[in-house]
A protein has these predicted regions:
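N-terminal leader segment of winged-helix/HTH proteins
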Residues: 1-28, 128-129
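N-terminal helix-turn-helix DNA-binding core of bacterial DNA-binding proteins
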Residues: 15-62, 82-83, 89
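Hydrophobic alpha-helical core bundles mediating ligand binding, dimerization, or RNAP-core interactions
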Residues: 21, 25, 103-110, 114-121
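Glycine-centered, phosphate/nucleic-acid-interacting loop/turn motifs that mediate DNA/RNA or nucleotide
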Residues: 74
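Short beta-strand "wing" residues that participate in macromolecule-binding interfaces
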Residues: 78
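Acidic/histidine-enriched, glycine/proline-rich intrinsically disordered or flexible terminal extensions
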Residues: 119-129
Length: 129
C-alpha cells in the first residue's frame, strides 16, 4: 500500500468556519431545499412546474437556484426527456433520500409546534414594545 492509500479520511467539523460541511449545511438548511427534499421524497420524480405548484410562494429564480444547488451537491438528478416541449424531471438521489426522514420530521415538528411558537412570539412582542 502506498502512503496516500493509508491516510485517514479527512475529518470535518461544522463548527469550524473554514469547514466545507458548513456550505452543505447552508444548502440543506435552506427552507426551499428542505421542502423540495420532502416534496420529492413523498411524490417521487416531479417536473419543474409540479414542484413550483407544490411549493407555494417560491419564485422561479429561487426554485431554479435551489434545484441547481441540490443537483451540484448530489441530492437530486435532473432528467431531460426530448419532447415538445422538453420535459425535465427532478428526483432525489440515494444521498438525497438519506435526508428524507430528517427533513420530514423537521417539517412535521414545525407544523405540530406552530401554535406554541406563535404564542411565544406574541408574548415576546408584547414584552418588547
Amino acid at each position: 500500500m502506498t502512503a496516500s492509500a493509508q491516510r485517514p479520511a479527512p475529518q470535518f467539523n461544522a463548527f469550524a468556519a473554514s469547514c466545507p460541511s458548513r456550505r452543505l449545511l447552508d444548502t440543506i438548511g435552506d427552507k426551499w431545499v428542505s421542502l423540495l427534499i420532502v416534496a420529492l421524497g413523498l411524490r417521487g420524480p416531479l417536473r419543474y412546474s409540479e414542484l413550483s405548484s407544490q411549493l407555494e410562494g417560491v419564485s422561479q429564480k429561487m426554485l431554479t437556484q435551489s434545484l441547481r444547488r441540490m443537483e451540484r451537491d448530489g441530492l437530486v438528478t435532473r432528467t431531460l426527456t426530448p419532447s415538445m416541449p422538453v420535459r425535465v424531471d427532478y428526483e432525489l438521489t440515494s444521498l438525497g433520500r438519506s435526508l428524507l426522514v430528517v427533513m420530514s420530521q423537521l417539517k412535521e415538528w414545525a407544523e405540530l409546534h406552530m401554535p406554541e411558537v406563535d404564542a411565544s412570539r406574541a408574548a415576546y412582542d408584547a414584552d418588547h414594545r
